[in-house]
Regions:
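Proteins with a high burden of low-complexity, intrinsically disordered sequence enriched in S/T/G/P/A and R
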Residues: 3, 12-13, 28-33, 50, ...
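N-terminal glycine-rich flavin-associated loop
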Residues: 7-20, 62-69, 109-111
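Residue-level detector of beta-strand structural context in well-folded domains
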Residues: 13, 45, 58-59, 140, ...
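Conserved, structured C-terminal
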Residues: 64-348
C-alpha cells in the first residue's frame, strides 16, 4: 500500500464468449446490465444460480457486442463454463453464441499500489496510463516485443492497479522486466495469502469463503450490481421471494476487536452473550459466523468479515465471538470496509 506489489494471478478462469447474440447471453448470465456498456471497458459482475444465490463473480470485458471475455474465480472456472454451456444448449438454443476457456492461453499479472502507474509507464513507455487516457475499468490491446498483450485497469486490493494478460511464452521476460524497471521502488512479489488480506481490508468478498451457497447479492451489500431495468437474468425471480428479502437474513458485516491486541478466528460463532458458562438447557443463540479474519499490519489490529443474522441493523453495536474453553472476544460490528471507504486510492 506504500509502493507497489505484483501477483501472478494466472489461475483465475478466463472465458471467451462470441456470437451474434453474445450481448444477450451475457445479460442473461449475470445480474448486471451490459447493454449500454462501452467497448474496451470492464465491469465487476455477479453470477447467480436459479435460487438467487451468488454462484461466482468476476470481470466482464466487452470488446464489442459480439465478443466478450469474462474472468471467474479459480475454483469455479470449470463449473462456470459448464453452467454457461448448459444454459446455451438447453434454455436458449436459439441464441447464436459459443464460448471456450482461454485460461491457459494467458499468464496474468496483477500490479497494484500507488506507484503502479509509474512502473507501468516504465515497462510500457509508449503507452499513456493517465486517468484521461486509461480510466478505471478500461482495457486495451498493445504490442509487446513480438506479441499482443491486454492491459486492464482494475483492482482487487483497493489500490491503483492493472491486470496484464500476456501469452505464457513471454510471461517470464515480462515478469523480470517489471522488477528491473522498479528497483528504486522495491517492487514486492506477493501471493494469494497477502491478496486475501488486502482484499479483506477493502471489504471485497471471495466467493466460497464469504459466501456459502445461501447468500444473495443483497446480503453482501451488492444490490447495486443488480440491473434494475433488466427483464430477466438467472436468479431474478428468486430474488423476489419473501424469504429472500427478509431483514433478518444473514448479512455481511465487518468486525473489529474491542481489545486491539486480540485476534479473531475464522469459522467461530458470533453471539450476543458474553458468558457461555450457562446450563445446556439455555442454548446460546448463534447469530452467524466469521467468514474471513486477518491481522492487518496497515491498521495494526485484526479485521474480520462475518455473516450475521440481521447484520445491517447491528452495525455500531457490540457482539461477541466465541473462542475455545467457553471464552469470548468482544467485537464492534462495522461496515465491511476498513480502508479507503471512498475508493480514492484506486482512482488516483
Amino acid at each position: 500500500r506504500k509502493t507497489a506489489g505484483i501477483l501472478d494471478g494466472s489461475t483465475l478462469g478466463k472465458i471467451e464468449i462470441k456470437g451474434k447474440d453474445a450481448l444477450t447471453f451475457v445479460n442473461l448470465m449475470y445480474t448486471n446490465s451490459f447493454t449500454k456498456m462501452k467497448p474496451k471497458t470492464g465491469r465487476y459482475a455477479l453470477m447467480l444460480g436459479e435460487d438467487g444465490m451468488v454462484k461466482d463473480d468476476g470481470i466482464v470485458c466487452k470488446i464489442n457486442d459480439q465478443h466478450f471475455i469474462v474472468t471467474t474465480t479459480t475454483g469455479n472456472a470449470a463449473s462456470v463454463l459448464a453452467h454457461m454451456e448448459e444454459y446455451a444448449q438447453t434454455e436458449w438454443p436459439n441464441l447464436n453464441v459459443y464460448m471456450n476457456s482461454i485460461t491457459e492461453q494467458f499468464a496474468t499479472f496483477n500490479l497494484s499500489g500507488p506507484k503502479s502507474r509509474v512502473i507501468m509507464s516504465r515497462v510500457f513507455n509508449d503507452i499513456d496510463f493517465s486517468n484521461d487516457q486509461f480510466p478505471f475499468m478500461s482495457f486495451n490491446n498493445f504490442k509487446y516485443l513480438d506479441t499482443e498483450i491486454r492491459i486492464l485497469r482494475a483492482s482487487f486490493t483497493g489500490e491503483l492497479g492493472y491486470e496484464i494478460y500476456v501469452p505464457p511464452s513471454h510471461a517470464l521476460k515480462l515478469w523480470q522486466r517489471f522488477f528491473i524497471s522498479s528497483r528504486d521502488f522495491d517492487l514486492v512479489p506477493y501471493g494469494t495469502e497477502t491478496m486475501h488480506l488486502l482484499r479483506a481490508e477493502k471489504g471485497y468478498i471471495i466467493v466460497g469463503q464469504d459466501t456459502d451457497g445461501t447468500v444473495t447479492p443483497v446480503d453482501l451489500n451488492l444490490n447495486w450490481m443488480i440491473g434494475k431495468k433488466k427483464k430477466d437474468f438467472i436468479g431474478k425471480r428468486s430474488l423476489t421471494r419473501s424469504d429472500i428479502i427478509k431483514e433478518s437474513r444473514k448479512q455481511l458485516v465487518g468486525l473489529v476487536p474491542i481489545d486491539k491486541t486480540l485476534g479473531i478466528e475464522e469459522g467461530q460463532h458470533v453471539i450476543e452473550q458474553k458468558d457461555l458458562s450457562l446450563p445446556i438447557k439455555n442454548p446460546v443463540d448463534m447469530l452467524g459466523h466469521v467468514t474471513s479474519s486477518y491481522f492487518s499490519p496497515n491498521l495494526n489490529h485484526a479485521v474480520a468479515m462475518a455473516l450475521i443474522r440481521g447484520g445491517k441493523r447491528k452495525i455500531g453495536s457490540r457482539l461477541f465471538v466465541s473462542t475455545e474453553n467457553l471464552n469470548t472476544i468482544a467485537v464492534e460490528v462495522v461496515e465491511p470496509n476498513f480502508i479507503d471507504p471512498k475508493n480514492e486510492r484506486m482512482m488516483l
